[in-house]
Regions:
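Hydrophobic alpha-helix immediately C-terminal to the catalytic Tyr-X-X-X-Lys motif of short-chain
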Residues: 99, 103, 107, 137, ...
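Protein kinase-like catalytic domain
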Residues: 56, 108, 146, 177-178
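Active-site loop of short-chain dehydrogenase/reductase
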Residues: 59-63, 112-114, 150, 156, ...
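Catalytic helix-loop patch of NAD(P)-dependent Rossmann-fold dehydrogenases
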Residues: 35-50, 57, 62, 71-117, ...
Length: 204
């Protein structure tokens, strides 16, 4: 176990010299990132640079990392969904992730480190982290309902999101490693189906 903000992570990666590196470490709470931009940058950008430097030193075949669909915050969705070339983040969190994607492209061009970027939509499933300042929707709803309370909604129940099961996400993680055609590509990970908060509440 090592903190990616510590440059020692470069030594660890170089020592074990894996063929592939999955990089999912970082700050994921929009609210925490907005409250402390320094920590957000330290974790999501500077920490990621340490990981990528380690990958370069170890001649890793490819780094597969988590970006976010939040980079589409200010983009207009077409009938076919969001295009992976789009990016217009508005929060500190999504901006750090957009920077990470640009860094990965730069490392590929200048240092030969191949990558696969994964833009997750709303991932749900077992072991979801509910300890954040504001829990993810699924976990937050379940906690409230189990406690005998109505779920808390910021805004209205008409808000719709694309929810994807963590098992499907993990299956794609493996596919990325096994299929070299995913190298130096960016993928949206979602179902393409929107569910509003009222339907989600009734489902739970």
């Amino acid at each position: 176990k090592v903190d990616i903000r510590n440059q020692y992570v470069e030594t660890v990666i170089e020592k074990f010299a894996p063929d592939y590196v999955y990089h999912f470490a970082g700050w994921v709470s929009i609210y925490d990132c907005n409250a402390d931009p320094y920590e957000a940058v330290d974790n999501n950008i500077l920490g990621s640079i340490n990981v990528m430097n380690g990958c370069v030193k170890a001649n890793v075949k490819r780094i597969i990392f988590s970006e976010t669909s939040a980079v589409y915050e200010n983009c207009k969705m077409s009938d076919d969904g969001y295009n992976e070339t789009q990016s217009d983040p508005t929060t500190i969190y999504s901006t750090t992730k957009a920077c990470l994607a640009l860094l990965a492209e730069s490392y590929q061009r200048t240092k030969g480190l191949n990558y696969t970027a994964l833009r997750y939509f709303n991932v749900a499933g077992p072991l979801q982290d509910y300890h954040r300042t504001v829990p993810p929707v699924f976990a937050g709803f379940i906690l409230r309902i189990m406690g005998g309370h109505n779920p808390i909604v910021f805004g209205d129940y008409k808000k719709s999101r694309d929810y994807i099961n963590v098992a499907d996400v993990n299956a794609f993680h493996i596919l990325c490693m096994e299929n070299e055609e995913t190298a130096n590509q960016t993928f949206n990970l979602g179902t393409g189906k929107m569910t509003n908060l009222l339907d989600l509440k009734n489902l739970i």
